[in-house]
Amino acid sequence: MMNLESFADLVAKIQKAIDAYVNETIYNSLITMGATLGTQWYKTGAITDATKKDFDTLIMDVGIASDSEVVVMGTRAALSSVYDLNKVEWASNDVKNEKYLTGRFGYYDGVRLVELKQGFKKNDTTQYLVSNNMLFIMPVGVEPMVKLVYEGDTQMYNIQDAGTNMDMTYSSEVQTKLGVGVITNRKFGMWDTTI
């Protein structure tokens, strides 16, 4: 560490790296469930006026199956196709100002729209963390369908004998074991806007 940063800073970076890994693992396990959900819960194609009825039906089906409020989640780019379905000719000035100031609507036909934070994959600014083509239709207030399990405690091993490494540095290794699973009896929907 050469006294360039404190041990507390190192631990904070380790925690941030583990957190990023867990978030990416959860997202990847959820995104791979799409095709296994069945045609009632997984749709593909552009969201336009022609597919509006199918989109509305998917939202309704998730709400009925979960007996709860539903939200539509996606990145700003993914939600843009839903924004385009909102007609503002009849809207109040407050709604028009919301679109003008934020570039988006907070609701689509009474359904809350939730923007997922986007980011780049580690060391690659050409790959996004979250697909810009995927919308998630998720129930609110039900038990989470994604389960995260840690096995045991996170362990840290240190080599603090300056003679062990040729350059006389110390080394540390952090180990944690976890698993992620998606329970598919909780109904949710996915819409892939890739054409």
Predicted regions and their residues:
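Extended amphipathic alpha-helical segments with heptad-repeat/coiled-coil character used for oligomerization
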Residues: 42-95
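A broad, structure-centric signal for solvent-exposed, well-ordered loop/edge residues
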Residues: 33, 79-80, 120, 181
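Short loop/turn segments at secondary-structure transitions that flank enzyme active sites
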Residues: 20, 24, 78-80, 178
